[in-house]
């Protein structure tokens, strides 16, 4: 029903943001609400989920995120909350690359995704996803992610930093770069 909403971020919550558009406030569940800034004017690509007479808006900064979300919820056993959690923990290109390579182990790192769900995702989506923005090795960024977690950084901060890294560098250099960004 709603393809996108243009508006200003008014409130940021743990799992969602509130956007005001033409005097109407929309609560939109988003993978990484803390990546938004209060007062920021933007376009959020949305999906309206209807279940048991409850309307829930899910929103994404990029069309690619929304497209992957829609494909994930088409998989048996994966609902909007699980798909949102997957997108909150990994980038679109890393997830797509893992699915296309059949890497079930990588997919089980996402909250609520066990081996059975990971295999179902691969079965249903392998070969149907196009990896556009990320051509590097997703395993390198996965190692950086794990290293930052081990150093005590939280998931939200890590997810803000990973897209800023140059995946062509070595793992050690990427960790140094990530730490430099995080300490600014």
Go through each PLM region and give its residues.
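Residue-level recognition of specific faces of alpha-helices
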Residues: 71-74, 83-86, 98, 106-109, ...
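Structure-specific DNA junction-binding interface
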Residues: 1-74, 179-184
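C-terminal extensions
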Residues: 127-184
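Amphipathic, charged-and-aliphatic alpha-helical interface segments
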Residues: 55-60, 80-99, 120-134
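Long, contiguous secondary-structure blocks with strong helical propensity
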Residues: 63-67, 97, 101-103, 172
